[in-house]
Amino acid sequence: MRNLILVGPMGAGKSTIGRLLAKELRLPFKDSDKEIELRTGANIPWIFDKEGEPGFRDREQAMIAELCGTDGVVLATGGGAVMREANRRALHAGGRVVYLHASVEQQVGRTARDRNRPLLRTADPAKTLRDLLEIRDPLYREIADLVVETDERPPRMVVLDILERLQQLPPR
């Protein structure tokens, strides 16, 4: 396996599950958003404010291309990474892709206090999350080797489920 790549909406558990998977597999963990912040010295909301979403997405595309060009990492992507076709191609080619699915209700609960999510600076975050999931869900599924539900499941249980199901996948 080249890399293990986690996609899904914000609040699905990509970073939490990714860190646990990396530890279990003895691989480095990378979060594309955190890598962008490290490189730029700025947080994601600041980048959105100064460069707009297109500017952030350009940075994200470059980071995903770089990280998918490596071998042997567990990679958590930002929720909107799948919006660009170039990213979907890179992610699919970069390794096994696991779509961590979470209901809008779970996403709302998990992101309610997080001020680091520019797209949720709206009057109705639940509606925003619903709208985003409606657009992005087919794109996550398009590139996923596995779809794993995270609602009401402890992270450790999700990790064990992923590891077991990865072993059952045919080579590609």
From Swiss-Prot:
Binding site for Mg(2+): S15
EC number assigned by the record: 2.7.1.71
Superkingdom, taxonomy of origin: Bacteria
Keyword Amino-acid biosynthesis assigned: yes
Catalytic activity, as annotated: shikimate + ATP = 3-phosphoshikimate + ADP + H(+)
Main location as per UniProt: cytoplasm
GO cellular component, one term: cytosol
SUPFAM superfamilies: P-loop containing nucleoside triphosphate hydrolases
Function: Catalyzes the specific phosphorylation of the 3-hydroxyl group of shikimic acid using ATP as a cosubstrate.
Protein known as: Shikimate kinase
Gene that specifies this protein: aroK
